Amino acid sequence: MKIVTDSGSDLTKEQCQELGVTMLPLKVQLGERTYLSGVDLSAEEFYELLDTTGQMPLTSTPSVGEFVDAYTKLAESDREILSIHISSGLSGTSNAARVAAKQVDADVTVVDTLTLSSGTGWQVEAAAHAIKAGWGKE
């Protein structure tokens, strides 16, 4: 089983690699610049920019197409995919993941964590450890 999450989980690239998790970045716009969260903007840098610019960021979810691409690639080695995302009450990420899940030839289960940041990250970590221990989605 493969795991997909978004950068709203606040897991680092290194943590995702260690856990075998695919992370899709949220897009963050501050002023005239757009960043890929977790790729070219770390959580620490994000908070520093908030402090120094005094601006509120605009964010956007990974696109349905980005989810389709990720699911399709992962399904080449394992058709079972667990897609764990930040709260649907705060972001459209879970919805984009659900739409994409219907477009791929894979068994994708989308989990709306109803939280964000480390709350989502902990759920991703727990799922990764459970999969390594041989547990199924149930």
Positions of predicted regions on the chain:
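N-terminal glycine-rich anion-binding loop in soluble enzyme alpha/beta folds
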Residues: K2-S63
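Active-site histidine-anchored catalytic micro-motif
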Residues: L82, S91-E138
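Hydrophobic/aromatic beta-strand patches that form the interior of the parallel beta-sheet core
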Residues: V4, T22-L24, L82-I84, T109-V111
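Short coil/turn connectors at secondary-structure junctions
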Residues: M1, L19, E76-E80, D105-D107
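Short, ordered loop/turn segments at secondary-structure junctions
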Residues: G8-S9, I86, T113-L116
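Hydrophobic residues in alpha-helical segments
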Residues: L50-D51, A75, I131-K132
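Catalytic cores of large soluble enzymes that bind and process phosphate-bearing ligands
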Residues: G38, Q55, T59-S63, H85, ...
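Glycine-rich phosphate- or other oxyanion-binding loops that anchor nucleotides, phosphorylated ligands
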Residues: T53-Q55, T61-G89, N95-A96
